[in-house]
């Protein structure tokens, strides 16, 4: 059985990156919540 985590920088950025977050309304809400909480990193 293969491991479920197969790291890829491109896939990571495309799904969880800043631009991906900004593209949807829900993603913008995520960023707003993380800013309100005072997170150092908004996106991984």
UniProtKB/Swiss-Prot annotation:
Q: Does the keyword Chloroplast apply?
A: no
Keywords, sorted A to Z: Ribonucleoprotein, Ribosomal protein
A single GO molecular function term of this UniProt record: structural constituent of ribosome
Q: Does the keyword Manganese apply?
A: no
PROSITE patterns under this entry? RIBOSOMAL_L34 (PS00784)
The cross-references to Pfam families, in alphabetical order and at most eight, read: Ribosomal_L34 (PF00468)
Family recorded in the similarity comment? Belongs to the bacterial ribosomal protein bL34 family.
Recorded hits in NCBIfam families, A to Z, give:
rpmH_bact
The protein, known as: Large ribosomal subunit protein bL34
The gene behind this protein is rpmH
